[in-house]
Design a protein with these regions (language model features):
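P-loop NTPase catalytic core of nucleic-acid-dependent motor ATPases
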Residues: 102-212, 367
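N-terminal nucleic-acid engagement/recognition segments and initiation subdomains in replication
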Residues: 1-128, 143, 147, 378-383, ...
């Protein structure tokens, strides 16, 4: 008897069963309310448990077979037509109310596919983080490479579980074509739809759409063509924790917290423009396919199994809470040494140093150096004067430029107006008459 009862309880509800659950008017007619639409969506045997909000893509998914042909999980216009037709069986045809009910039901059945994936992993105890870049790409098996990989993996995990968390580090793989650098990041993203290499411009108003639904974003083209100006834009972009974007059906823009991390690949050995304040956001790791144990695409199934355990190991570290998303002070020195290996020749610094060796005046400003040391005739952009300031200040602090210091107040320069700049520690007898000191009040007005 109990077996028969259990079978009845498990049997799908018919349309008539669901109709009995709906609120009706006094004449027995079904009320066309949002709540009745919700009841249908939650209990109709075709639609029940089908509609969920994907917290990664921030879109509504249909997550089970629903009886009509479809491709992909995301709810689309054709799906809506089928749902509207299904709702007509209950005498409800208000598209607006049905759409509202769908959003409510989806929101109450939200899920995060990457969190579900990571939480479902069980580590086998074999360490792979320290070896993965050597295994697939022939990178060095040293502490620096291990820490670089660990920071990147833990940053990716934290971005998923704590969207919008601060993580502005880019792991950059440097090596020849065909080494498998892009394939490594694609497989590291676990599913191809969680990976993207389609980010081409950072000033695109729809940049959020390029990030939406992805976990690992490869920026190969921008890294390959980076210059001093674009590297500043990339650094600023990496430091963002959210995008503000209005989804078409929404009335107001909303903050979209970042859930992705960014990776770089290049075969350029001088991909990092000279940055005197440090390129701490970029972690370069040289790779050599000839030294790798396997090519990542030789046996894709085996590579994916390896990567599953890589994430399982990283999750074990993440759950322990015993980690930092930055290098130790000692390892920072190693990072800076690696960055120096991939920096472009600092031609501007050399030109400025040479100019100062022959210069007889007692003061210089960035605009003067831009024109007289670098030979430019146009007005410098802000980033260009900032680069000159970095050359001077870093050169002075490192001892590369001796006998100069930044002057404390703004000075008036005959050709360049009131400027902050640098002065000789011991001024020569000539040149002082060409400048006049500006009071703090005037200086602040011109900064």
């Amino acid at each position: 008897m109990s077996k028969e009862v259990n079978q009845e309880e498990c049997a799908p509800r018919t349309v008539e069963d669901v109709k009995e659950m709906l609120v009706k008017h006094s004449n027995g007619e079904i009320q066309r309310t949002i709540q009745n639409c919700i009841t249908i969506l939650q209990n109709d045997h075709v639609l029940a448990d089908a509609i969920r909000l994907n917290l990664l893509s921030e879109r509504i998914d249909i997550v089970k077979p629903v009886g009509w042909p479809r491709s992909g999980k995301t709810l689309n216009d054709i799906d809506m037509k089928y749902i509207l037709r299904r709702m007509e069986k209950y005498g409800i045809s208000s598209e607006k109310k049905i759409e509202s009910a769908i959003r409510i039901v989806a929101n109450e059945n939200r899920y995060h596919p990457i969190r579900d994936y990571l939480n479902g992993l069980k580590w086998d105890g074999t360490e792979r983080i320290a070896h993965v870049l050597y295994h697939f790409l022939g990178a060095a098996e040293d502490e620096y490479t291990c820490e670089a990989m660990k920071i990147f993996l833990l940053g990716a995990i934290k971005r998923v579980f704590q969207p919008g968390c601060k993580f502005e580090t880019m792991l950059c793989l440097v090596g020849g074509q065909g080494a498998g650098k892009s394939s490594f990041f694609r497989l590291l993203a676990v599913k191809d739809e969680w990976f993207s290499d389609d980010l081409r411009r950072l000033d695109d108003d729809n940049v959020y759409r390029k990030l939406q639904g992805h976990w690992i974003i490869e920026m190969s083209e921008m890294i390959a063509t980076a210059n001093a100006k674009s590297i500043e834009e990339i650094k600023s972009f990496l430091s963002k924790q959210k995008e503000t974007y209005k989804v078409p059906y929404e009335t107001h823009p909303a903050d979209r917290l970042r859930q992705c991390v960014f990776a770089g690949t290049t075969n350029r050995q001088d991909f990092l423009p000279r940055d005197r304040t440090g390129n701490r956001r970029f972690i370069p790791v040289p790779v050599d396919a000839e030294l790798a144990e396997v090519h990542i695409l030789d046996d894709e199934a085996e590579s994916r199994a390896y990567i599953n355990q890589l994430w399982a190991e990283a999750m074990t570290i993440y759950n322990s809470g015993n980690y930092k998303l930055a290098f130790s002070p000692a390892m920072q020195e190693t990072l800076q040494a690696h960055q120096q290996d991939f920096m472009q020749e600092d031609a501007q610094a050399g030109m400025i140093y040479a100019f100062l060796e022959d210069y007889t005046g007692d003061r210089v400003c960035s605009k003067q150096l831009y024109a007289e040391a670098l030979g430019n005739t146009n007005i410098p952009a802000e980033w260009e004067t900032r680069a000159i300031c970095e050359i001077m200040n870093t050169g002075i602090s490192r001892g590369d430029i001796q006998g100069w210091q930044a002057h404390k107040t703004a000075k008036r320069y005959p050709k360049y107006g009131v400027q902050k700049g640098w002065e000789r520690v011991t001024s020569p007898e000539t040149g002082a008459e060409d400048f006049s000191e500006i009071t703090d009040e005037i200086g602040r007005a011109h900064v």
